[in-house]
Amino acid sequence: MLFRSIALITPDSERTFATHLGAAIELTGDDLNSDQFDDYDLLYLEGYLINNKELVEKACDLARKAGMEIALDLASYNVVETHLEDFSYIISKYVDILFANEEEARAYTGQDTEKAMEKISEQVQITVIKTGSQGSLVKRKEELIKIDAVPVKCVDTTGAGDLYAAGFLYGYLNDQPLSKCGAMGSLLASNVIDLMGARIPDSRWPEIKNKVSDIINR
């Protein structure tokens, strides 16, 4: 069975996940080989995979040998609390870009958002902390950028983090400055939180692509 997750949405539009890892927990490092990492620039890891640390470490080793950068999303504060030691090892050894929301950053560092940003930045090249309706914070070395959220009526936050990361990494892999990467992340996230479900409808993508072009060209 493949990975499945049930999203339970509360009246405040927040979500709680009931997750079954399925085949992701059955795979081993032997299922990966260097050919699978050829011709890619970046490996994106979902934090739930830390339940299979052997697989994560093998993927990171192969990605590094292939010259790839590695991005990680912490996924869930309770997953971070349960696997704190493993996360610390993987992040400090392999991760270049780390995505977290405020709860996840607090679970990882034991600090509030500002101090968490500083602590995480000692381990990775780029730190991104998503701050809900306040937007997000992006830090690289001494550069700290505040990214505004795109104002929309929030219905369901499921998928917001994944879409933010997708937009951010699209900008990053196309050599955009971090401010524009964050703006693309906010744009995509805003297009999934104003409706139920974790996918942006196909009908919205033409307008989204136009807005991404506007961000790049401004």
Predicted regions and their residues:
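Short, charged, surface-exposed secondary-structure boundary motifs
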Residues: L27-T28, E81-T82, Y108, C154-T158
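Conserved phosphate-binding/catalytic region of the ribokinase-like
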Residues: D61, E85, T113-R218
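Conserved N-terminal subdomain of the carbohydrate kinase-like
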Residues: M1-L42, K209-R218
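Short, acidic/turn-prone active-site loops that include or flank metal/cofactor-
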Residues: L21-A24, A75-Y77, V150-K153
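Alpha-helix C-terminal capping/helix-to-coil transition sites in glycosyltransferase folds
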Residues: D38-D39, K93-Y94, Q123
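Conserved beta-alpha-beta core of the PfkB/ribokinase-like small-molecule kinase fold
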Residues: L42-E118, Q134-G135
